[in-house]
Amino acid sequence: MDYPREFDVIVVGGGHAGTEAALAAARIGAKTLLLTHNIETLGQMSCNPSIGGIGKGHLVKEVDALGGAMALATDEAGIQFRILNGSKGPAVRATRAQADRVLYRKAIRSRLENQPGLWIFQQAVDDLMVEGDRVVGAVTQIGLKFRGRTVVLTAGTFLNGLIHVGLQNYSGGRAGDPPATSLGQRLKELQLPQGRLKTGTPPRIDGRTIDYSVLEEQPGDLDPVPVFSFLGNAAMHPRQLPCWITHTNARTHDIIRGGLDRSPMYSGVIEGVGPRYCPSIEDKIHRFADKASHQVFLEPEGLDTHEVYPNGVSTSLPFDVQWDLIHSLPGLENAHILRPGYAIEYDYFDPRALKSTLETKAIGGLYFAGQINGTTGYEEAAAQGLLAGANAALQALDRDTWTPRRDEAYLGVLVDDLVTRGVTEPYRMFTSRAEYRLSLREDNADLRLTEIGRKLGLVDDARWDAFSRKRDAVAAEVERLKSTWVNPRNFPAETAEPLLGKAIEREYSLSDLLKRPAVSYAALMRARNADGSLLAGPGVTDDDILAEQVEIQVKYAGYIARQQDEVQKHLAHEQQRIPADIDYDAVSSLSFEVRQKLKTHRPETIGQAARISGVTPAAISLLLIHLKRLHYGSRKQAA
């Protein structure tokens, strides 16, 4: 039957991409439907019980700055929080949290159920309704037809998913869930370019059978306790737990090598390429044969379970090898395995067939987000989901769509990498992928994106009010530091020397003093003038987050300004549009190879064209000349 209500946006899939997509579309004002095969698994953390990390934490902060759910859900579910790279510069500092799986799922579901304009329906989707070159809806496994102006597909690892344990395999989307075989077949019929990728997960351990006395404890950060959301605070966190560290050894490695002949990866059973930066333990032993041991992090799965996730031993080896492998690890000699590790192969679609909005080029109104685009990780999925859901809603409501630039957000880097370069292995975000990372820090994600989110309709009043107060307070304090001056008379040697290492000889602004490497904002604000008054101003000193933002903006002002100059130089050509119907055969002097690559990728801008492998700067110059001629010719015709 035809479902009696029509929708602006239909989101297929209830994982990290799907939930953010549905929430974003509904926040913008689109009538949104979320279709999931199981309401109980909305927001399920299918693999590791953690959020964030280098590059990934930056994406979570950006999702939060745009009104998304992941950061706040993590603050409500996080059982350990740490700042990675804390001793390094602010560009590469990143937040990471262990999360209670049940609490995280509960936090996400609560937001979905309480979001106005969002309907949830439990049914697996078997087919898409396509009329001409446009999607018009989705069909579920019982033949129920839902019509919508746009569809966001977030199928994760479910498309023709195949689970491997040793040389045994069976169909599945993840352990305990069926695959989306019919939908996978339907997408093949639409002739969208696709491939196979692989990911994996480790066996799970009963924590009661672990000997913690021989392990190294890894507590979270306590002073201060990190938070993920710009609206979050440490009081939201549940009870905190430590993680523990053990190591593989020579016996572990011998056990793994002895089982490689029955590994689906090394016997040719698995065709898909696995994630380079999250390799299986058998891959580590094979690729790093000279390494005597590898760290294994024992991560609690939650407050009300004894289940432990051994991060670092993802494997698809036969269970008897997994058994010996786990019991060879110090502290796990008597461990009980609750679930076997496995690998899963799944279909993905070449993201070069997407526009930068994440809409497919071939089928209007159809958006892809998450692992279906060849990425790996909850954070990458959530970021794509938010963007795809927002753009699906904007298109359905006849509004202009939006994509962040590479200099605006890690989300912009992620999408640009996907649609211009494609993937040959599961894509993971790192800070090293961003050429403007000094400007794309975790701490300023809201200052970069919340105003944009407000204009799009993604940011509610509460978030906007909190952001506005922060923005104004930081700006006022930075200005105060620039306009407040000290000199040898009102800032005497007995005050200056402990702070600066020597007395001052001339007049300086407080901003000048803060730019010195050894001077912190907190120390400067504790210093006193000759009359005994503090240098501190009102409203910022007692707020660690505001104080950090002020210090970074002042200390790195010169570097950030230089980076912004560089951005402006590149921006003109970066954003220059290429007509969708351009005839590359008419561009004189292009090589055959470049012509073919441009025809295949159909870049939307000069910037995208320049990042296609094999497209040279000389070819870009020829393309610019051709576009100039087209523009001149069209103006001449109009006259």
From Swiss-Prot:
GO terms for biological process: tRNA methylation; tRNA wobble uridine modification. It holds the Pfam family SAM_GIDA_C. It is found in: Cytoplasm. GO terms for molecular function: flavin adenine dinucleotide binding. FAD binds at residues 13-18. Keywords: Cytoplasm, FAD, Flavoprotein, NAD, tRNA processing. Its cofactor is FAD. GO terms for cellular component: cytosol. InterPro entries: FAD/NAD-bd_sf, GIDA_C_N, MnmG, MnmG-rel, MnmG-rel_CS, MnmG_C, MnmG_C_subdom, MnmG_C_subdom_sf. Its main location: cytoplasm. NAD(+) binds at residues 274-288. NAD-binding protein involved in the addition of a carboxymethylaminomethyl (cmnm) group at the wobble position (U34) of certain tRNAs, forming tRNA-cmnm(5)s(2)U34. Homodimer. Heterotetramer of two MnmE and two MnmG subunits. NCBIfam families: mnmG_gidA. Belongs to the MnmG family. This is tRNA uridine 5-carboxymethylaminomethyl modification enzyme MnmG. It comes from Bordetella petrii (strain ATCC BAA-461 / DSM 12804 / CCUG 43448). The lineage of its organism: Bacteria, Pseudomonadati, Pseudomonadota, Betaproteobacteria, Burkholderiales.
